[in-house]
Structures are given as structure tokens and as C-alpha cells.
């Protein structure tokens, strides 16, 4: 089933999403003839029978597993198994449609100035997943979004969703890039546990001199929210403690991203003001998730 000399390595990180992972793998399998490719599943200590399902129903898939140490480490765990020149990070809560591999790989190969590309992600209700194209969370963009509730700039709502264009960041649910670029920038930063690692990776790709492209000429369905335990329909559960950690992860990642990438780009007093604001937001988020988890 796997290509002997794959052009593309598809990495799927799984944590207790057995049914969705099976659907995802079936959709990938249906379109593997589009590009010489291999599929790698990295499992973060699932307990729902996912590992057994993969080994039984998809014996041709390369498989690796380890402790649940987060999104970054889980994806990076697959690195030694990669034989393709291109790497696609794909979420298990996605369904791949016709020509996705063919068109996105073709686009990346034909544009040497592009370091990463994504397709259009569509939610089950037919609407676009807006997080697929984002601007970097600079202080001004973050202030508009978190304080003023204005997401238009953050989500590129000033540009039609069916128009191919350059963006700051794309979502970790579908990131196609070159392995040589990942090796250059160091793959995912493992200091991020969950949330923010995809934005940081895009930032490093930009720093390396490449463009990030949103390419809506082909689509993938994204059952969004599953990895955060928000979609009960799929019978995916997380404990209240896990849910609290996941909801706080975004704020923690926000602080990490700012300190790593934006610190010293502004006056020092402004840097500390931003960190103060993030920590206030962290406290508010902590109180909120603590109260919600008690019900």
C-alpha cells in the first residue's frame, strides 16, 4: 500500500480518536494513488483501542507510539520514520477528499518560494474553518481579538475565502511542507504542549525566507473540537482536569510565542505590559474553566 519511494509522508497524531482516525485513514487510503506516499500514525498513549485498530485494519501504516507529551512531541516522534521529501501534518479528525494530495503537492512543487501550503478546511456544517488562515498574534491583533472581540483581521476576513493568498499562519490540522524546511527550522517546538505550536512553526518558516499559502482549490472536512473534548457527538471524552489544561494551554502558548518571537521588537515597557496582560487573561481563563468544570 505504501509507496516504495514516497514523495509525501503523511503524519497523523492520534490520542483516543479511534472512530475518527479510522474514517481519516480510510479517506487517505482512497486517494493514495494521487501521489507516491506513505502514512505514519503516531499515538500518544491512547486507551480507546486506537493502536489495535490501526494494526489490525491498516497494517501497511507505519506506526509509532509513546507517552502523551503533547502535540509537538507526538508529531516529532514520527520524524525518524519519514522517507518522503514532503511532509503533511494531518489531524485524525479530518476527512480527505478527491485531489487534495494531487493539487496541494503540485502547488508546493511549482512554487519554490513557498514553504508551506494548506487547503480549505470545511466544518461538518459546510462553513469554512476560519482558523485555517490567521495573522500572527501580535499585540495589536491580539488586543482586537481578545479585548475588542474583533476577529476580522485575525481571520483574514477582508480577503474572500475562495481566493488563494499568502497568510501568516495556517492550522496544524493540515500543513504541507518540505522535510528539508522542517529540518532547517527544527520541526515543532516541543516547549509547546498544545496550541500555538502550529503558529510558531509558521513563524519559523517565514523567518527562513519562505511564504505560507492558503490554497482553497481543494477541501478537507474538519470535525473541529474533537481533540479538545468539545464534540460529544463523536463520544470523545476528556476528564475535567484534562479539559482545564487544554483550555489554559492557549494562554500559556500565547505567552511563550510572544517571549520567543516578539520580545524586544517593542519598547521594553511595552513588552512587560503585554506579559502582564497575558497573565491577567490567564487568571481570568483559569477562574472560568475552574467554575465550569465544577458543574
Task: Show where each model-derived region lies.
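Short aromatic/hydrophobic "clamp" motif used to bind/position activated sugar donors
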Residues: 87
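Active-site-adjacent helix/loop segment of glycosyltransferases
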Residues: 207-292
Amino acid at each position: 500500500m505504501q509507496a516504495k519511494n514516497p514523495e509525501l509522508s503523511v503524519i497523523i497524531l492520534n490520542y483516543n480518536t479511534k472512530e475518527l482516525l479510522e474514517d481519516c485513514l480510510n479517506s487517505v487510503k482512497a486517494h493514495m494513488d494521487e501521489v507516491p506516499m506513505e502514512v505514519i500514525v503516531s499515538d500518544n498513549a491512547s486507551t480507546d483501542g486506537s493502536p489495535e485498530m490501526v494494526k489490525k485494519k491498516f497494517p501497511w501504516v507505519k506506526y509509532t507510539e509513546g507517552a502523551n507529551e503533547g502535540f509537538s512531541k507526538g508529531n516529532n516522534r514520527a520524524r525518524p520514520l519519514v522517507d518522503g521529501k514532503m511532509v503533511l501534518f494531518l489531524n485524525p479528525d479530518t476527512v480527505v477528499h478527491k485531489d487534495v494530495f494531487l493539487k496541494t503537492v503540485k502547488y508546493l512543487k511549482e512554487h519554490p518560494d513557498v514553504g508551506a501550503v494548506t487547503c480549505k478546511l470545511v466544518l461538518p456544517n459546510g462553513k469554512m474553518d476560519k482558523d485555517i488562515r490567521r495573522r500572527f498574534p501580535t499585540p495589536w491583533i491580539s488586543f482586537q481579538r481578545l479585548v475588542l472581540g474583533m476577529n476580522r483581521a485575525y481571520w483574514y476576513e477582508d480577503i474572500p475565502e475562495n481566493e488563494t493568498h499568502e497568510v501568516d499562519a495556517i492550522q496544524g490540522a493540515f500543513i504541507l511542507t518540505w522535510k528539508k524546511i522542517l529540518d532547517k527550522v527544527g520541526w515543532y517546538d516541543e516547549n509547546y504542549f498544545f496550541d500555538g505550536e502550529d503558529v510558531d512553526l509558521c513563524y519559523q518558516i517565514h523567518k527562513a525566507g519562505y511564504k505560507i499559502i492558503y490554497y482553497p482549490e481543494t477541501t478537507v472536512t474538519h470535525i473541529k473540537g474533537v481533540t479538545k473534548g468539545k464534540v460529544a457527538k463523536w463520544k470523545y471524552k476528556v476528564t475535567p482536569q484534562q479539559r482545564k489544561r487544554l483550555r489554559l494551554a492557549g494562554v500559556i502558548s500565547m505567552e511563550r510565542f510572544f517571549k520567543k518571537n516578539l520580545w524586544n521588537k517593542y519598547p521594553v515597557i511595552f513588552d512587560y505590559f503585554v506579559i502582564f496582560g497575558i497573565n491577567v487573561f490567564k487568571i481570568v481563563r483559569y477562574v472560568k474553566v475552574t467554575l465550569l468544570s465544577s458543574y
